[in-house]
UniProtKB/Swiss-Prot annotation:
Protein name: Choline transporter-like protein 4
Species this protein is from: Mus musculus (Mouse)
Functional description taken from the UniProt entry: Choline transporter that plays a role in the choline-acetylcholine system and is required to the efferent innervation of hair cells in the olivocochlear bundle for the maintenance of physiological function of outer hair cells and the protection of hair cells from acoustic injury. Also described as a thiamine pyrophosphate transporter in colon, may mediate the absorption of microbiota-generated thiamine pyrophosphate and contribute to host thiamine (vitamin B1) homeostasis.
One of the GO biological process terms: otolith formation
Topological relation to the membrane, as annotated: Multi-pass membrane protein
């Protein structure tokens, strides 16, 4: 007895009875004010970064292609010309990179022009046509020349100056650019030395992009055909999730028992199977001494020692689980009772089930703001132009300052006939451009901090609502009228700083994990096993640290929602309270995880099976208006429905999990604060009182507990 008391004292003193305590404290003050001020200053800086990015950035260089002069195709004067045509795409196709072109502009040493449509048929200028005019030779194809070319210009002169293309290839638009189509037979003049094989080899790096475009079109068509059925599947997932949670008050005990028996049965079958395999290989005399060491791990399945080791491991797990059932059965009953009470709490406050929608909207705002800011920062800078000549060996072009900067508005006073001032890219010499890396790092920190703050806000708000349910002595009479909105306003008003403190700690650990993942990716080709081992150990340690901080933050937010203390005090009190009841914590955590995993499996699996049978045509539609959609890839709406069902189930069950954790901490506080007397009655439900062998004294003289 003395030893147990010393252990409890090592984990802090039990909560003392407070006659004024009636649930989440209403008269509270602001907590972690310094962190709140720092967070608000950081958000202000984040907004300034966004404004700087908006002023200097130009995302059009990613969204729209550009011609040789740097003008955008598809906007402004080129609104009706959304595609860019390369005069000689084979001169750059070998080193082309679609994403690089989208981000950096001109990458090919060939003129580019905005066009309304891509060429549909092969065509080329014959040698005998060089002396004719552009209007005579090109005709309607003159729109593929640069706008400045005159129809009376001689063709040979226009080709020397790079004003018109010598040939056209059948092309398809992809990412706003005209790319030649592969595997199409055509013939061009022999002096060009261009044929179907040359084009196919030259644009081999672009074929995947073209194919990807075709696939993307088919995917879009499938979504257009099946979007309403996907919404139906998501509605089924929502209904199943809500129904599962509400029915837990009725089926929690048999369901948990069924799951535990199922785990025991699976382990028992594993032991039986391992024993059978062990006997087979023992009779054959297959031993590891005969096999020796090998890197072919599948070979170890053919030796008796492998199956014996697996048998021992499964037998140990089976024994541990049986011992837990025997010695921790009362704690399992407590966990089941808390699950039932959580289901009851959710039923009394149905609005809490839809709070994840608020979290989702806030997360979309945070992630969207970061993405737009990062895009604008990445595209900041002033356009730069350089001199370029298609053939520097032409008479008069020997001393041309190629690659030197120029002004596109200034006249070209040069003897070189094909000299041009073309767009090169965007400068990196401005203030915003020199600080680009630092601003992007600031944005990444802002992303992690704001996202974690939004998640912390949701946890604290839900904890405040569910705590008001537990500490209502007469349910539902004593439950506040608007518990969720009251908790939301209370959290924002008093505890923004505390949430920011916890979110910052978690964000720093997550950023460290991202940096380690990047280093590990860079060292993946390294042959240094020591460095790889060290990185792996650091990753493992940071993963464990992140899990612990998430667990600590979650319980700290519950204590903040109830008592209104600062983050450090709340985290300490929550940790000490849990350490004084560590066995109950472990049992409740595992039982809840098992139950919620089964719930997710039920929802996602049910929606997945129904989607598969419907979209694959195995279930016919209900009448003419509800026919099965004709799809290119029937697995696409199936996977979309499954992922959507998982997101919905995770959102609903995260609320339920927060409810269980909140009620559990309140239950532990209730045990320490109260003793069941008239002055200090227990707030827990009768089922928990019965399991613990406790009861509240009946009020005498018709007295009832004051609110």
């Amino acid at each position: 007895m003395g030893r147990k008391q010393n252990e409890n004292e090592a984990h802090g003193n039990s909560a003392k009875y407070d006659p004024s305590f009636r649930g989440p404290i209403k008269n509270r003050g602001c907590t972690d004010i310094i962190c709140c001020v720092l967070f608000l200053i950081f958000i202000l800086g984040y907004i300034i970064v966004g404004l700087v990015a908006w002023v200097y950035g130009d995302p059009r260089q990613v969204l729209y292609p550009r011609n040789s002069t740097g003008a955008y195709c598809g906007v402004g004067d080129n609104k009706d010309k959304p595609y860019v045509l390369y005069f000689d795409i084979l001169s750059c196709a070998a080193a082309i990179n679609i994403i690089s072109i989208a981000e950096n502009g001109l990458q090919c040493p060939t003129p580019q022009v905005c066009v309304s449509s891509c060429p549909l048929a092969p065509w080329a200028v014959e040698v005998f046509q060089f002396s004719k005019t552009v209007g005579e030779v090109y005709g309607e194809r003159r729109n593929f020349c640069l706008p400045a070319v005159s129809p009376d210009m001689i063709v040979e002169e226009s080709l020397q100056k790079g004003l018109c293309p010598r040939f056209l290839l059948p092309s398809t638009p992809a990412l706003g650019r005209c790319f030649p189509l592969p595997n199409i037979n055509f013939t061009l003049p022999e002096d060009l030395r261009i044929n179907n094989t040359t084009v196919s080899n030259g644009i081999s790096g672009l074929l995947d992009s073209i194919n990807a475009r075709d696939v993307s079109v088919k995917i879009f068509e499938d979504f257009a055909q099946s979007w309403y059925w996907i919404l139906v599947a998501l509605g089924v997932a929502l209904a199943l999730s809500l129904l599962f949670i509400l029915l837990l008050r009725l089926v929690a005990a048999p369901l948990v028992l069924l799951l535990i028996v199922g785990v025991l049965a699976v382990l028992a079958y594993g032991i039986y199977h391992c024993w059978q395999q062990y006997q087979v290989f023992r009779d054959k005399g297959a031993s590891i001494t005969q096999l020796g060491f090998t890197t072919n791990f599948s070979a170890y399945q053919s030796v008796k020692e492998t199956w014996l080791a697996a048998l021992i491991v499964l037998a140990v797990l089976e024994g541990i689980l049986l011992l837990m059932l025997i010695f921790l059965r009362q704690r399992i009953r407590i966990a089941i009772a808390l699950l039932k009470e959580a289901s009851r709490a959710v039923g009394q406050m149905m609005s809490t089930m839809f709070y994840p929608l608020v979290t989702f909207v806030l997360l979309v705002i945070c992630i969207g703001y970061w993405a737009v800011t990062a895009l604008y920062l990445a595209t900041s800078g002033q356009p730069q132009y350089i001199y370029w000549a298609s053939n520097t060996s032409t008479p008069g072009c020997e001393n041309v300052p190629v690659n030197m900067t120029c002004d596109p508005m200034a006249p070209l006073n040069s003897s070189c006939p094909n000299l041009k001032c073309v767009f090169k890219g965007y400068s990196t010499t401005g203030l915003a451009q020199r600080s680009l890396f630092n601003l992007q790092i600031y944005g990444v920190l802002g992303l992690f901090w704001t996202v974690n703050w939004v998640l912390a806000l949701g946890q604290c708000v839900l904890a405040g609502a569910f705590a008001s349910f537990y500490w209502a002595f007469h349910k539902p009479r004593d439950i506040p009228t608007f518990p969720l909105s009251s908790a939301f306003i209370r959290t924002l008003r008093y505890h923004t700083g505390s949430l920011a403190f916890g979110a910052l700690i978690l964000s720093l650990v997550q950023i460290a994990r991202v940096i380690l993942e990047y280093i590990d990716h860079k060292l993946r080709g390294s042959q240094n096993p020591v460095a790889r081992c060290i990185i792996c150990c650091f990753k493992c340690c940071l993963w464990c640290l992140e899990k612990f901080i998430k667990f600590l933050n979650r319980n700290a937010y519950i204590m903040i929602a109830i008592y209104g203390k600062n983050f450090c005090v709340s985290a300490k009190n929550a940790f000490m309270l849990l350490m004084r009841n560590v066995l109950r914590v472990v049992v409740l955590d595992k039982v809840t995880d098992l139950l919620l995993f089964f719930g997710k499996l039920l929802v996602v699996g049910g929606v997945g099976v129904l989607s598969f049978f419907f979209f694959s045509g195995r279930i016919k539609g209900l009448g003419k208006d509800f026919e099965n959609p004709n799809l290119n890839y029937y697995w696409l709406p199936i996977m979309t429905s499954i992922m959507g069902a998982y997101v919905i189930a995770s959102g609903f069950f995260s609320v339920f999990g927060m409810c269980v954790d909140t009620l559990f901490l309140c239950f532990l506080e209730d045990l320490e604060r109260n003793d069941g007397s008239q002055e200090r009655p227990y707030y827990m439900p009768k089922a928990l009182l019965k399991i613990l062998g406790k009861k509240n004294e009946a009020p005498t003289g018709g007295k009832t507990r004051k609110k």
